[in-house]
């Protein structure tokens, strides 16, 4: 039987050494599922609530024992006996139990851990891999990796404003070949940086965090690394950015502080458009502040026909904010982070709403991760076609890539790679 027998949570540590929630769900037929919850560094103000203990004497206030207790008492009691294969009902029960718009009462980290573990348990009970359980027999598209090879902003202790400089190996037929390409570029970039006298220490997401002279220098060294790895920029490999503009936007003045310049919204749009003219940039995430809808509209009008414009802090995996973007013609893609909204059901709802309206979706990690690889299965299950899960270092990032390699092997000849489809979309 797929009825929930028991739910247990514990406090574990994420990739930054901060506490996070891990949940285990056991069904009456003996099947079990486990999931761990990620955590972000640059978080949008509209995200679901991550419940921390706040006791500064323990883990500097970042403990999650309250969230763990909520799982082991209130949530466990409410869900016992429910059918794990009815994910929507399970998630709705937790939403109603919490009773707040942003899951502040129980904590989105408590609710999400259970939601993901329930999906894993149901998949195990039905003897299916998670991607097939969630996506059905037609789930066979491997996502193009957005490989974060230079970290800046909130993800690194350096002078680079842009949070992530990524490479996207799109011009390949198989995911495994694309992953090899990105990895080879990463290793070549290490030598390029070392030869220039820069540090090759890595940031939270496994990319290098050199103290470069400017954001543009980051683009230049990446172009050099692509060439030295033997690949062609703009034909096989493209560049993607996560500006995380909210982090350098002053709401009182309406100015963006970038490269030691104060820019208006119009100037920010022109600045990003200029980069797209000079470099093979295929995607820009959070190019504007999370609530600067006016500048977002201008950016979409200017370059949205040739560049993927991704809403992360803008949409926070929330169908209401995404619907506003759709209605107003703002952005053309949504970043999917399970902990921004807090349940598997709401995450899938956001992906499906995006796809119905011609928006792309990207399954994404957070800067604070664990060995949990749920987002890899989710990317294949929902045919997102793209995944953002860090660089070619740190085992918390490799866990997702390695899971995708296993899925590709399992699918065999049926496997598709999403890179060429996305390349066609941006090149026409």
UniProtKB/Swiss-Prot annotation:
<comment type="similarity">
    <text>Belongs to the enolase family.</text>
</comment>
<comment type="pathway">
    <text>Carbohydrate degradation; glycolysis; pyruvate from D-glyceraldehyde 3-phosphate: step 4/5.</text>
</comment>
<dbReference type="InterPro" id="IPR000941">
    <property type="entry name" value="Enolase"/>
</dbReference>
<dbReference type="Pfam" id="PF00113">
    <property type="entry name" value="Enolase_C"/>
</dbReference>
<feature type="binding site">
    <location>
        <position position="366"/>
    </location>
    <ligand>
        <name>(2R)-2-phosphoglycerate</name>
    </ligand>
</feature>
<dbReference type="InterPro" id="IPR029017">
    <property type="entry name" value="Enolase-like_N"/>
</dbReference>
<keyword id="KW-0479">Metal-binding</keyword>
<feature type="binding site">
    <location>
        <position position="242"/>
    </location>
    <ligand>
        <name>Mg(2+)</name>
    </ligand>
</feature>
<keyword id="KW-0324">Glycolysis</keyword>
<dbReference type="GO" id="GO:0009986">
    <property type="term" value="C:cell surface"/>
</dbReference>
<feature type="active site" description="Proton acceptor">
    <location>
        <position position="337"/>
    </location>
</feature>
<keyword id="KW-0460">Magnesium</keyword>
<dbReference type="Pfam" id="PF03952">
    <property type="entry name" value="Enolase_N"/>
</dbReference>
<feature type="active site" description="Proton donor">
    <location>
        <position position="205"/>
    </location>
</feature>
<dbReference type="GO" id="GO:0006096">
    <property type="term" value="P:glycolytic process"/>
</dbReference>
<dbReference type="GO" id="GO:0000287">
    <property type="term" value="F:magnesium ion binding"/>
</dbReference>
<keyword id="KW-0456">Lyase</keyword>
<dbReference type="InterPro" id="IPR036849">
    <property type="entry name" value="Enolase-like_C_sf"/>
</dbReference>
<dbReference type="InterPro" id="IPR020810">
    <property type="entry name" value="Enolase_C"/>
</dbReference>
<keyword id="KW-0964">Secreted</keyword>
<feature type="binding site">
    <location>
        <position position="285"/>
    </location>
    <ligand>
        <name>Mg(2+)</name>
    </ligand>
</feature>
<dbReference type="InterPro" id="IPR020809">
    <property type="entry name" value="Enolase_CS"/>
</dbReference>
<comment type="function">
    <text>Catalyzes the reversible conversion of 2-phosphoglycerate (2-PG) into phosphoenolpyruvate (PEP). It is essential for the degradation of carbohydrates via glycolysis.</text>
</comment>
<keyword id="KW-0963">Cytoplasm</keyword>
<dbReference type="GO" id="GO:0005576">
    <property type="term" value="C:extracellular region"/>
</dbReference>
<dbReference type="GO" id="GO:0004634">
    <property type="term" value="F:phosphopyruvate hydratase activity"/>
</dbReference>
<dbReference type="InterPro" id="IPR020811">
    <property type="entry name" value="Enolase_N"/>
</dbReference>
<feature type="binding site">
    <location>
        <position position="337"/>
    </location>
    <ligand>
        <name>(2R)-2-phosphoglycerate</name>
    </ligand>
</feature>
<dbReference type="GO" id="GO:0000015">
    <property type="term" value="C:phosphopyruvate hydratase complex"/>
</dbReference>
<feature type="binding site">
    <location>
        <position position="367"/>
    </location>
    <ligand>
        <name>(2R)-2-phosphoglycerate</name>
    </ligand>
</feature>
<feature type="binding site">
    <location>
        <position position="388"/>
    </location>
    <ligand>
        <name>(2R)-2-phosphoglycerate</name>
    </ligand>
</feature>
<feature type="binding site">
    <location>
        <position position="163"/>
    </location>
    <ligand>
        <name>(2R)-2-phosphoglycerate</name>
    </ligand>
</feature>
<feature type="binding site">
    <location>
        <position position="312"/>
    </location>
    <ligand>
        <name>Mg(2+)</name>
    </ligand>
</feature>
<protein>
    <recommendedName>
        <fullName>Enolase</fullName>
        <ecNumber>4.2.1.11</ecNumber>
    </recommendedName>
</protein>
């Amino acid at each position: 039987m797929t009825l929930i027998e028991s739910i247990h949570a514990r406090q574990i540590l994420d990739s930054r050494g901060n506490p996070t929630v891990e949940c285990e769900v056991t069904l009456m037929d003996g099947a079990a599922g486990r999931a761990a919850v990620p955590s972000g560094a640059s978080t949008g103000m509209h995200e679901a609530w991550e419940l921390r203990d706040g006791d500064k004497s323990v883990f500097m206030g970042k403990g999650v024992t309250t969230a763990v207790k909520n799982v082991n008492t209130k949530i466990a009691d409410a869900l016992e006996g429910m059918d794990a294969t009815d994910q929507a009902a399970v998630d709705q029960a937790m939403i109603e139990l919490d009773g707040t718009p942003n899951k502040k009462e129980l904590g989105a980290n408590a609710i999400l851990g259970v939601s993901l573990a329930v999906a894993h348990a149901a998949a195990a009970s039905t003897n299916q891999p998670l991607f097939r359980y969630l996506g059905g027999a037609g789930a066979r598209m491997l996502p193009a990796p957005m490989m974060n090879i230079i970290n800046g902003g909130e993800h690194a202790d350096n002078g680079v404003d842009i949070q992530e400089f990524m490479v996207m190996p799109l011009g390949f037929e198989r995911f495994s070949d694309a992953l090899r390409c990105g990895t080879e570029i990463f290793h070549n970039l290490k030598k390029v940086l070392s030869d220039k006298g820069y540090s090759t220490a890595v940031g939270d997401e496994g990319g290098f965090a050199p103290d470069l002279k400017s954001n543009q220098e980051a683009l230049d060294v990446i172009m050099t690394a692509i060439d030295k790895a033997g690949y062609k920029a703009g034909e096989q490999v493209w560049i993607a950015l996560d500006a995380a503009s909210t982090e350098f936007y002053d709401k009182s003045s309406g100015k963006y502080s970038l490269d030691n310049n104060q820019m208006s919204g119009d100037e920010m749009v022109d600045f990003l458009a200029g980069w797209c003219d000079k470099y093979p940039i295929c995607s820009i995430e959070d190019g504007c502040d999370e609530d600067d809808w006016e500048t977002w509209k201008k950016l979409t009008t200017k370059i949205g026909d040739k560049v993927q414009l991704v809403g992360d802090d803008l949409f926070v995996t929330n169908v209401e904010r995404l619907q506003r973007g759709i209605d107003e013609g703002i952005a053309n893609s949504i970043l999917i982070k399970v902990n921004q909204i807090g349940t598997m059901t709401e995450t899938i709802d956001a992906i499906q709403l995006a796809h119905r309206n011609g928006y792309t979706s990207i399954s994404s990690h957070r800067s604070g991760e664990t060995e949990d690889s749920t987002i890899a299965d989710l990317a294949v299950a929902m045919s997102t076609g793209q995944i953002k899960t860090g660089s070619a270092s740190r085992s918390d990032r490799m866990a997702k890539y390695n899971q995708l390699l296993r899925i590709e092997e399992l699918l065999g000849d049926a496997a598709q790679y999403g890179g060429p489809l996305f390349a066609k979309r941006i090149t026409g």
